[in-house]
Regions:
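Conserved signature/switch motifs of ABC ATPase nucleotide-binding domains
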Residues: 137-140, 158, 190
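Helix N-cap at the start of a conserved alpha-helix in ABC-type nucleotide-binding domains
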Residues: 174-176
Length: 248
């Protein structure tokens, strides 16, 4: 099991965001986190990659990739994160470097120094996300969907055990959003776990996965027999998605 949370209380700025969280993730799973803005989705993800602390008195159990999160030292956080790929809604690419040089920068920063291996790995991840022909382009020359593909490629560079994607399709049109989720879903076939927060409830039917919902200060798992109207109700509660048209 990659993540095992039992009765975890999650705080942000001393304010209780989620209470008694039970959350588990196994290898190769695709997991959705849904809920309204401010419901705790991002806060939960932040505890997983060590951005938010978990105090020992606020958790019966909180283990991520073998690390007991209430006890983890800050010096261990970089090593933990190197086992993860983290994707945000805002792409955070280096705009003064080409696609290939963005990826090369990450590899060199994480200890890669063999030029041939670096070049080979960049080619592998760009092929995985369908961006081989864009390796020499600057980020400003790419559409929003293309930039997000590069971000996914960047997240895959070090062959992570899990990918945490916080609203990765939030600024994309529906077709491009579906393409991005399809790429993320495919990564699960190699054993990578993907945990994705989203407002876009329509993706759940098209790309099935386990679903957790943040609501009213708690986290609950929706099971396969959950009444369909429950998700329809959730969609009505969640703020409308603004999806500007972008050329892919």
């Amino acid at each position: 099991m990659l993540i095992d949370y039992k009765k975890v209380n999650i705080y942000q700025d001393e304010r209780l965001i989620l209470k008694d969280v039970d959350f588990q993730a196994e290898q190769g799973e695709f997991i959705y986190l849904i809920g309204r803005v401010g419901s705790g989705k991002s806060s939960l993800l932040k505890t997983i990659y060590g951005e938010l602390d978990i105090d020992s008195e606020d958790a019966e159990k909180a283990v991520v990739l073998g690390e007991k999160m209430p006890d983890i030292k800050r010096s261990r956080i970089p090593a933990l994160r190197r086992q993860m790929g983290i994707i945000f809604q805002d792409f955070q690419l280096l705009h003064d470097r080409s696609v290939a040089k963005n990826l090369k920068f990450v590899l060199q920063a994480t200890g890669w120094n063999d030029r041939k291996k670096i070049s080979r790995r960049i080619g592998e991840v760009l092929e995985q996300v369908g961006m081989t022909d864009k390796k020499d382009k600057m980020p400003s020359e790419l559409s929003g969907g293309e930039q997000q593909r590069v971000v996914i490629a960047r997240a895959l560079l070090n062959m992570p055990k899990m990918i945490l994607a916080d609203e990765p399709t939030g600024n994309l049109d529906p077709e491009t959003a579906a393409n991005i989720v399809s790429i993320l879903k495919d990564t699960c076939q190699t054993g990578t776990t993907v945990i994705m927060s989203t407002h876009n409830i329509s993706l759940l039917d098209r790309f099935p996965g386990r679903v957790y919902r943040c609501k009213d200060g708690g986290l609950s798992q929706l099971n396969d027999k959950q009444d369909a109207c429950d998700l329809d109700e959730e969609a009505a509660l969640i703020e409308p998605i603004i999806e500007p048209a972008q050329d892919e």
